[in-house]
Amino acid sequence: MKNNQRPVIRSTTVIGVIRDGKAALGSDGQMTLGNTVIKHSTRKIRRLYHGKLVAGFAGATADAVTLLDRFEEKLEAYNGKLDRAAVELARDWRTDKYLRRLEAMLAIVSHDKALIISGTGDVIEPEDGIVAIGSGSMYALAAARSLMKHSSLPAKEIVLESLKIAADICIYTNDHIIVEEV
């Protein structure tokens, strides 16, 4: 690491799935600083808007919590309308000098919608109802798509199994898994 660089904090696999009118979102608990694991049980997901949504984050923790707080404010302002709150947060993220510097991504699920709000302020709604962010996201996404196609597992089990698979592959993902369902 060069003197003028901050240590890179890598952590997290967050995945959410919608199936049969139920949604689940989960994450691992590992946080690393550079090449060292500094915490095994970080909580990276939380329920929002009276328990009707679950959101998870990847990236710098303080930045992500700031964004989650802003997102909750938008949800309250727009009566829980997920799309509208996400677009308004993304708009603020792109235009506000302070927010533009935040390094985080959000994944959000409700019983019928899954969204990613990217670090560039984009709002992405995947066609298959699966959202994945973080260092192990592509492993978890591949596992979830396969399980959706070839099993009848409920959303919560798909999330759990996908995170276990990602933990077996990604060195920045562990098996201290938390899953919430709506």
Swiss-Prot record:
One of its GO terms (biological process) is proteolysis involved in protein catabolic process. Keywords: Allosteric enzyme, Cytoplasm, Hydrolase, Metal-binding, Protease, Sodium, Threonine protease. A double ring-shaped homohexamer of HslV is capped on each side by a ring-shaped HslU homohexamer. The assembly of the HslU/HslV complex is dependent on binding of ATP. It is found in: Cytoplasm. Protease subunit of a proteasome-like degradation complex believed to be a general protein degrading machinery. This is ATP-dependent protease subunit HslV. Pfam families: Proteasome (PF00227). It comes from the Bacteria. Belongs to the peptidase T1B family. HslV subfamily. Allosterically activated by HslU binding. Gene3D superfamilies: Glutamine Phosphoribosylpyrophosphate, subunit 1, domain 1. Its EC number is 3.4.25.2. CDD domains: protease_HslV. Na(+) binds at A167, C170, T173. NCBIfam families: ATP_dep_HslV, PRK05456.1. It catalyses: ATP-dependent cleavage of peptide bonds with broad specificity. GO terms for molecular function: metal ion binding; threonine-type endopeptidase activity. It is an enzyme of class 3 (hydrolase). GO terms for cellular component: HslUV protease complex; proteasome core complex. The active site is at T12.
